[in-house]
Amino acid sequence: MLKIIPLLLAALGVVSAAAYAAPELTVTNFGQSIESENVSGANDVDDLWLWNTVGLKYDDWSFGLTAGKQWNVDFDDHDDGYKKGIESDNSRIQFDVAKPVTENLKLTGRYRGQQNYDRFQVGYAYNYGMFLSSGDFFYDSVNGDGHDTFHAEWFPVGVSLGPVQIKYYFEYVKNLGDIQLGKQEESFDHQIRVYAPLYKGERLTLSTEGRFTIMQDKEFNGKTKKGYNVYDDFGRNRLYLKANYALTENLDVFGTFGYEMRKYKGKEGANNANDDYWSNVVVGYNYKF
């Protein structure tokens, strides 16, 4: 009997250690994607990015690492400063962290480093019943010429109506430091955003997102010399179509197409700028563990 007691105690110790094992840092997913952006009248492809992403988890903490490389692509000759050919002039490294603090509230943080700026960001996401609220607030430290800026990208209120979400979006940008006379100090942007599923099959899911600008305004230090342009009321509208296809239980491929139409109005004597458009295409894969 005396010989059995130490064995029982040792077994209990092993079980206790397993039951109360410290959490481990684990990889949850990784993926790659290619993203292109284009504005009418500029390069063939204004921005072409290759993204590499990794997700991690530790206890109830979530982490993300993103690394990207950017290229400008143009195959035509221009007289307006755009260069012909393929040229890389930027890259990005980004760290994300998120932690739920209550059943309804999650806090987030982000650091983004690029050749032209460093970003320090905090945010939150809150939901209660059918009501939603979230926001990201960040400071951009500009590398080189230009002003450091403070940004607020805020969804003060939103509602879930079944699978559809409707949110009010407010964006505020403040240029910091000494602003020269006639230069922009801050800008305001008000939008309604709508998110909705379109189709859900055994492997394929389709969804859409709409962004509709209600109004935009800008504030300057004194009067501008030549006036300025803002988006016309309801003059900027963007639609996304998003698709995801599950190749296996762990591997998904996805794609996104976005298109935005823009209409401007001049202020302080400026002529209305020409209408233009913006487009965005993303294709990639994500592997989940």
Tell where the protein language model's regions lie, with residue ranges.
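Outer-membrane beta-barrel "beta-signal"
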Residues: 259, 273-289
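Residues that define the transmembrane beta-barrel architecture of outer-membrane proteins
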Residues: 44-50, 87-93, 116-120, 146-153, ...
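Outer membrane beta-barrel transmembrane domains
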Residues: 93, 193-260, 265-269
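Short glycine/proline- and aromatic-enriched beta-strand/turn motifs that initiate or cap beta-hairpins
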Residues: 20-79
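Detector for outer-membrane/organellar transmembrane beta-barrel domains
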Residues: 127-228
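Residues on the lipid-exposed face of transmembrane beta-strands in outer-membrane beta-barrel proteins
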Residues: 52-58, 95-99, 122-126, 152-161, ...
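Transmembrane beta-barrel strands of outer-membrane/channel proteins
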Residues: 29-36, 65-69, 109-113, 135-139, ...
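Repeated loop/turn-to-beta-strand initiation elements of outer-membrane beta-barrel proteins
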Residues: 25-26, 60-65, 100-107, 128-135, ...
